[in-house]
Amino acid sequence: MTTEKETATPADVEVASQEEQIDQTTEAQVEEPSIEAELAGCYAKIHELETYIAEADKREQDIQLRAQAEIQNIRRRTEQDIEKAHKFALEKFAKELLTVVDNLERGLVALDTAVTDEKTQALVDGVEMTHKEFVSTLAKFGIEAIGEIGDVFNPELHQAISMQPAENIEANHLSQVLQKGYTLQGRVIRPAMVMVAA
């Protein structure tokens, strides 16, 4: 009994060899597109990840810039608040002191009409010195009086009680100051109560 291998002719061997080569070539061709497709997919994924990283970097830079700007704004507002606190810390205290100045001025007006002898004049001189020293001390801390007869009426600084005709005073100028106003570092803490020339 002979086997097929023994009876195979050289032509059969060659055909079998060619079939093997075709199978290997087909497998290689099948594998090559598969590898190329996989490689193309990897490149696409790499490009997608690079794009994502670039966008994430931009977002991070934007967040960082916004955070720095916010920090600068907070720092600036804090400095302004501290400056205002220092500048206007005396406001409430100063408002209370203004009544003392008003009373000293009223006392001086009353004493001017009542001076009859040297003892009374000494009292007037003492009150005047106290008043001047008190006003000088207020000025050292930025508290200034506003509202003099003849000044131009300014609604931001003056509170008009009424308007009346006045001799020797132009219209819209102060004809009478009923109560002096005061500013603290340029900010009005009490407007002057005035009469305005019509």
From Swiss-Prot:
Question: Record's PROSITE patterns?
Answer: GRPE
Q: How does it assemble?
A: Homodimer.
Keyword Transport recorded:
no
Q: What is this protein called?
A: Protein GrpE
- Which organism encodes this protein? Haemophilus ducreyi (strain 35000HP / ATCC 700724)
Q: Which family does it belong to?
A: Belongs to the GrpE family.
Kindly list the GO molecular function terms attached to this UniProt entry: adenyl-nucleotide exchange factor activity; protein homodimerization activity; protein-folding chaperone binding; unfolded protein binding
What keywords are assigned to this protein? Chaperone, Cytoplasm, Stress response
Which PANTHER family does the record associate with it? GRPE PROTEIN (PTHR21237), GRPE PROTEIN HOMOLOG, MITOCHONDRIAL (PTHR21237:SF23)
Classify the source by domain of life. Answer: Bacteria
Query: Tell me, what does this protein do in biology?
Result: Participates actively in the response to hyperosmotic and heat shock by preventing the aggregation of stress-denatured proteins, in association with DnaK and GrpE. It is the nucleotide exchange factor for DnaK and may function as a thermosensor. Unfolded proteins bind initially to DnaJ; upon interaction with the DnaJ-bound protein, DnaK hydrolyzes its bound ATP, resulting in the formation of a stable complex. GrpE releases ADP from DnaK; ATP binding to DnaK triggers the release of the substrate protein, thus completing the reaction cycle.
Which HAMAP family does this chain map to? GrpE
**What gene does this protein come from?**
grpE
